[in-house]
């Protein structure tokens, strides 16, 4: 089929103009489109899957439908695995067999796509109104913040890598006592990766400020 790369499409929802830049649009023999997106990611993203990929690519499918009136029948991630190891691939059955993997992403119904896009735009519009009128803004979820939870690491003297990570201090201390002398518990504070590294407005965000003040 024909390939179209890096096209940005625009559409209007609830009076707002929104857009998305699609890495690859492949036109199939039946005239439908396959959307492909490139990601440099970890092996664990492939093993466990990422909900954010489904949201992103279904939004792209919605854009194509709105702008071109053409059906999208397949969504794919071309994943470049930065931490892939050939030795692991030999012995682990669920481990990716190559450093580059194509992952099929679930395609939602058109009504699901419509509802998702409208809901997200409405949330942003409500947040803007709340900010203007100095009202509390709905907080971002852990998924939206790419949050890594705080952990309690059981450490062994002379070893850099944790023996085990626990969610609670009590579990970590109990584990330490079982292991005996030479083991300690280190607290590893969680972090909202998207907020700290990728958000342009975190400096103005009350949720981000509170999270850091609590730390």
Describe the residue ranges of each PLM region.
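Short, conserved loop/turn and helix-capping segments at secondary-structure boundaries
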Residues: 50-54
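Catalytic cores of nuclease domains that cleave nucleic-acid phosphodiester backbones
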Residues: 1-48, 68-74, 106, 110-118
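Metal-dependent nuclease catalytic regions and adjoining charged, substrate-binding loops involved
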Residues: 14, 62-215
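Short amphipathic alpha-helical face segments that pack within enzyme cores
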Residues: 55-63
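Residue-level signal for functionally critical sites in structured catalytic/ligand-binding pockets
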Residues: 6, 21-24, 37-39, 56, ...
């Amino acid at each position: 089929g024909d390939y179209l790369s890096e096209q940005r499409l625009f559409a209007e929802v609830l009076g707002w103009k929104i857009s998305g830049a699609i890495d690859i649009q492949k036109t199939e023999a039946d005239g439908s489109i396959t959307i492909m997106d490139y990601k440099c990611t970890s092996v664990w993203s492939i093993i466990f899957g990422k909900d954010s990929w489904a949201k992103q690519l279904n939004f792209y499918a919605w854009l194509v439908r709105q702008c071109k009136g053409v059906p999208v029948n397949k969504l794919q991630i071309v994943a470049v695995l930065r931490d892939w190891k050939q030795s692991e691939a030999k012995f682990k059955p669920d481990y990716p067999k190559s450093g580059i993997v194509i992952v099929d992403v679930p395609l939602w119904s058109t009504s699901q796509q419509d509802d998702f896009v409208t809901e997200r735009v409405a949330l942003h519009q409500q947040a803007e109104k709340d900010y203007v009128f100095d009202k509390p803004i709905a907080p971002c979820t852990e998924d939206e913040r790419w949050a890594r939870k705080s952990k309690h690491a059981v450490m062994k003297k002379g070893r850099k890598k944790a023996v085990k990570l626990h969610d609670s201090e009590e579990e970590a201390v109990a584990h330490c006592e079982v292991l005996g002398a030479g083991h300690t518990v280190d607290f590893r504070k969680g972090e909202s990766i998207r907020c700290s590294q990728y958000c342009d407005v975190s400096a103005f965000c009350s949720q981000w400020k509170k999270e850091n003040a609590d730390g």
